[in-house]
């Protein structure tokens, strides 16, 4: 009978000791101003003014809530949003669109749909078909560039490519890899493409005015084997006339992605720049073929900084890639080097200092501090 009483007393002492110790060590400083209700005399509650009406109490409560205070309320503490650092926009200016014209076109489209009896009947019978190509074209024309910008910020492309500067990809960039004779593997905004699917030169299309010049590059953000802040240039086409990609100058020939085994998922980005004039890229030209990784070391930020007066980023498309069997062929046959293999080494598990008398610990407690892997549970 004494055991429960003794444990209860010991538990109470521990709780009292922990509370008192924390109160002493808290080092509470005096408040910066008067505390709430500190001006009320609590010695004689009968003399306090009574509201006698809920409306009077509500008006008084609203006045008190709107009055400035030196402390922060719960909502102010957890609902306060820190203003993000304003980033530099290096992209093309937004198109000038009349809001009135947009509203008129939208109302006209709604009137036409309501007047179309066949569409109404198909929608009621659930047999209506939606043209997805038209929906995607409308999305790319309106809110698609801003969605792509948010995805690029989520994947850290602007942070690693342009050191935090941002731009809205206003020119839709369509990239697709040919897989077999009839199939295509498209590149969207972060979908996964295997190195086998990206072995050949992709098909790139975009809308451009006649007489304009463009630059297209493909870079790997996470694949450099020696420098952590460098990239590998996989493809660079310059002075592209209009949207005729095949007629552009091949400044750097295409090299398939080669994410090393065990290095995880890599990001590869297609960037489209609009040139204001013809540019001489002879300093950035690579030999053809170019299978020396040192010659493909690249930094997008330095490249753009060098030609920022004559070109502007306009389009963006990126995908993710991880190792497969074709990477071994690229290292052995194309790059003529041994294939690097990485392995994640987990840190040793942390254990607190061993106690001489492990009170209320399981029988496996000693296994944490044994050099051998032979368990003690079931031996004794």
From Swiss-Prot:
Q: Where are the transmembrane segments?
A: none
| Keyword Acetylation carried by entry | no
Task: Please indicate which superkingdom the organism of origin belongs to.
Answer: Eukaryota
UniProt keyword annotations, A-Z: Coiled coil, Mitochondrion, Ribonucleoprotein, Ribosomal protein, Transit peptide
Q: Report the subcellular localization.
A: Mitochondrion
Q: InterPro entries, per this entry?
A: PEBP, PEBP-like_sf, PEBP_euk
Predominantly, its location class is mitochondrion
Residue stretch of the organelle transit peptide:
1-26
Give yes or no: UniProt keyword NAD: no
Q: Name one GO cellular component term.
A: mitochondrial large ribosomal subunit
Q: Which Gene3D superfamilies match?
A: PEBP-like
- Coiled-coil intervals: 99-127
Q: How does it assemble?
A: Component of the mitochondrial ribosome large subunit (39S) which comprises a 16S rRNA and about 50 distinct proteins.
Family stated for the protein in its record = Belongs to the phosphatidylethanolamine-binding protein family. Mitochondrion-specific ribosomal protein mL38 subfamily.
Q: What is the name listed in the Swiss-Prot or TrEMBL entry for this protein?
A: Large ribosomal subunit protein mL38
Q: Which organism is it from?
A: Pongo abelii (Sumatran orangutan)
Q: Gene symbol?
A: MRPL38
